[in-house]
Amino acid sequence: MMKVLVVVALLVTLISYSSSEGIDDLEADELLSLTANEQTRKECIPKHHECTSNKHGCCRGNFFKYKCQCTTVVTQDGEQTERCFCGTPPHHKAAELVVGFGKKILG
């Protein structure tokens, strides 16, 4: 009976050690993934910044990704140029307002 307990204890120790090694590998992979996501986040264009040259590079807001919103600007010379900025579309603003109000009510 004592031999069985010793063997079971050894097996449990080996299994826990091997699973902890696997977890360490997973944590290293997650750390690399998080670093890559952070790098991507740094490269995105923040809210209210110009996105004329990169219309799909806006960052994420609280709930939605910001959209590149463009307007045509007419200079004093009569030249028309397109200027774009990252912002929250009106329907996203409304959805965020409803969600924020719901959170306040539900606590």
Swiss-Prot record:
PROSITE patterns attached to this UniProt entry: SPIDER_CSTX
Annotated disulfide bonds: 44-59, 51-68, 58-86, 70-84
Keywords: Disulfide bond, Knottin, Secreted, Signal, Toxin
Residue ranges annotated as propeptide in the record: 21-41
GO molecular function: toxin activity
Subcellular localization, as worded in the UniProt entry: Secreted
Superkingdom per UniProt: Eukaryota
Tissue specificity statement from the Swiss-Prot or TrEMBL entry: Expressed by the venom gland.
Pfam families tied to this protein: Toxin_35 (PF10530)
Signal sequence range: 1-20
A Gene Ontology term for the protein's cellular component: extracellular region
Domains as described in the record: The presence of a 'disulfide through disulfide knot' structurally defines this protein as a knottin.
Family of this protein: Belongs to the neurotoxin 19 (CSTX) family. 04 (U1-Lctx) subfamily.
Protein name per the record: U1-lycotoxin-Ls1v
